[in-house]
Design a protein with these regions (language model features):
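Beta-strand elements of repeat-based all-beta scaffolds
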Residues: 1-126
């Protein structure tokens, strides 16, 4: 049980971008550079882990909840990952839920629609 504070590593967290109209750029997903985010690792009394990545404005950009017994230390394997995307005024614009993150990582989503800031595929709600 406890809390650890670390920094992110290169290639660990997607840095989602918005275009000039505030729409999510789905064709470009660079990563945050090493040390750009604070990585807060919380372990509960049962040994379950939650990892939050916060930017310099203290906004949570990624929250990973342990989904398997032995999740990978870095990346998304074994985690239920949720991304939070903010506009230039720090307003939360999009939430990418765990199932959508899985489909994105598998390459199964090439286009998005959104409804109320939640990402949808063109034919299925994720």
């Amino acid at each position: 049980m406890g809390i650890e504070y670390k920094l992110n590593k290169d290639g660990e967290v997607f840095k989602w971008l918005l275009d000039s109209l505030g729409e999510l750029k789905t064709n470009s997903r660079p990563y945050y550079r090493s040390g750009e985010l604070t990585r807060i690792i919380t372990t509960d009394e049962h040994g379950h882990i939650v990892v939050e990545y916060k930017d310099k404005q203290q906004r949570v950009v990624l929250k990973k909840v342990q989904a398997e017994a032995n999740p990978a230390e870095y990346g998304h394997t074994g985690w239920a990952s949720t991304y939070y995307i903010y506009d230039q005024y720090s307003n939360l614009r999009y939430v990418i839920p765990p199932q959508a993150v899985e489909h994105i990582l598998e390459g199964n989503i090439t286009a998005f629609e959104s409804q109320g800031g939640i990402l949808l595929t063109s034919d299925t709600t994720l």
